[in-house]
Curated annotation (Swiss-Prot):
SUPFAM superfamilies: PurM C-terminal domain-like, PurM N-terminal domain-like. One of its GO terms (cellular component) is cytoplasm. The active site is at H51, H97. Substrate binds at S96, H97, N98, H99, R118, Q242, E314, S315, Q316, S554. Monomer. Part of the FGAM synthase complex composed of 1 PurL, 1 PurQ and 2 PurS subunits. Keywords: ATP-binding, Cytoplasm, Ligase, Magnesium, Metal-binding, Nucleotide-binding, Purine biosynthesis. This is Phosphoribosylformylglycinamidine synthase subunit PurL. The gene is purL. ATP binds at Y54, K93, D514, G551. InterPro entries: PRibForGlyAmidine_synth_PurL, PurL_linker, PurM-like_C_dom, PurM-like_C_sf, PurM-like_N, PurM-like_N_sf. Belongs to the FGAMS family.
Amino acid sequence: MTAPTESSPFSPADLARHRLSPQEYRRITELIGRHPNLNELGMFSVMWSEHCCYKNSRPLLKGFPTTGPRVLVGPGENAGVIDIGDGLRVAFKIESHNHPSAVEPFQGAATGVGGILRDIFTMGARPIASLNSLRFGPLEDARNRALFRGVVHGIGHYGNCVGVPTVGGEVYFDPTYSGNPLVNAMAIGVLETPEIVRSGAAGIGNPVLYVGSTTGRDGMGGASFASAELSDASQKDRPAVQVGDPFTEKSLIEACLEAFRTGAVVAAQDMGAAGLTCSSSEMAAKGGVGIEMDLDLVPVRETGMVPYEFLLSESQERMLFVAEKGREGELIALFERWGLHAVVVGRVIGEPLVRIFHSGKVVAELPARALTDDAPVYPRAVLPEPPAAILKLRAFDWHSLAEPTDYAEALLTLLDSPTIGSKSWVYRQYDHQVQNNTVIVPGAADAAVIRVRPQSFGPGEVEAVPFTERGIAATVDCNSRYVYLDPYRGAMLAVAEAARNLSCVGATPLAVTDNLNFGSPEKPEGYWQLAMACRGIADACLELMTPVTGGNVSLYNETQSDGRTTAIYPTPTIGMVGLVEDIHRTCSQNFKSPGDLVYLLGGGEPTLGGSEYLACLHGVAAGEPPVLDMALEIQVQSVCRLGIERGLFKSAHDVAEGGLAVALAECCITGNLGLDAVLGANHPRADVVCFGEMAAAIIVTIDPCDQVACELWLECSLAERWKLLGTVAAQSFDLRVENRDCRISTSCERLKTTFEQAIPRRMEHIPVTEAPQR
């Protein structure tokens, strides 16, 4: 079509409020052959937002590997689905709720959990676990403490009330997140329906059902809000934050799963971002059909709502179904039995349009593809080389920095870092045992492990499998400082660490869901970070054979304050799931018995570049991140999994932030045991040996009775890439560096107190001088 010749009814200010550029408006008029009305402009505003259409990232996402022998559903549906054998299928996905959580932390985080759970059960899967990846500014700041407290409370409240265990996650703290926290929520479910539920509408004349809660004005324009930078004025956007009701969500889960098992549901889509607009247009476009709806039939919680508000509302706990004609009454009765609304609001039509009625009039009529597939895409030029500022940071010479005069105090300083310290303040607010399937609880290992129960497909129907020992392991990982210094290598390291964490509990990595949290793609450096990180994820996933089944992109994570714009560290969070063949053969990180032998498997070249040691003790974020030897990484992970499967390894823990000294201390703290060990002097500086970070490194313990057999096996499997470090002790922590005047000798109680108080003392605003003695 061609653009209309008459002048636009909308001013530049109108378009700016809808976050549409003049060029995008012209494209709209070309697609529909006329000027849109206000309702239609609002629909385009949300559907063409970065949050919904990925207009800046879509070309980059095409580089991800998305297929594999276990992948049943890849990107494009509500969640990815994989086959884990024994007739069991698992759905999983990660999504962000960053901007809402910055404005209203409790509701922003709570509805983030609710939204990701709906993505899971919309596929026909019962949610069995959730995880989260969180980023905040330093807790010394009162506003950051308030955001942290609100977000954790919101996650705990929603997850606890809805009855889905929060089994794991990660929390990082850095000044770049002070104005823009990150809240990424991941959920996992096991399919309870014979067929995977799809979202493409089908069957001309089939009724369209609105089910769930009522529609109000909450969350108005939330998708557009989530696609803009935050500023000092963002607090005025509180109406763009949704309000959740976990008890309604619990009923919705049960009602939907029961409805799917009847076979009366042709297609289903949850109403998340962009509400009715997104659910109707995506269902129509995916099915190659149209949908018409009458807004007068939509259940409401507020009076006087106009079509614009209906179409852009993001009220929670709502779904849109296409039902088999003649069976809508059966579904309505089912939902009413669960105390939920279920109303026929429209029908599937042959014309590929979304047609909206209100008060007997057509108030919006748009091609479904114009709202979805025809959204603009902006392939941008990638900088041919890193920005000068990044090159300068990478060239930082940390060799000139003074080494610690007291290595024990240096270790305690790292354990007191909220990024490294215990996250028990967080996970003790979560119910991680509800459903009674959690095999490994938060804080006990490098990944969560959840039992998978046999699934019944309905009354009188055969279970998927009569009995299984299988379980699912899950983790979320990303060292965003690495990604800031080197987006490509940092993203690869994030994927490798996620796989390593799964391997440390005995799980085989299977597939990935990613959450790309970045700044503005319109800035050359921002797009370069995004593009290079996507390449890193793609290459690492290919090497590890972990296809990407879906995810989320959150851009414009920048804060404008006092005329200055600050972007977050680029944070491509990797959610990864793995298969545990036997839940009775898993591994935790804690040392088990005095006298056990402690080994290091693998271990690349340690470096202080981008390390927590540099950040905590020197206030520096610079240098080259660790080098990743992917062949060694794969080899070390394979050995770790096999050692756990054989019952040889009693504990396993990967070496991450803080290096070997911190990893060993964590094993002691969680096991209430000590250590007597010597680190090989593989670097002239003792602080690099103790606190340098590396990839492909795992600490394991064995029973001394198995020493000869174990070392013969390690020699065959890893050649010289392993080392006996020492033994587990009863109470004291004694760590030395070979041929160096360096010794860390302290009590485990001192380590534990410092580690466990890292977050609580800051949340209680206790100065270091008044904190428990280290």
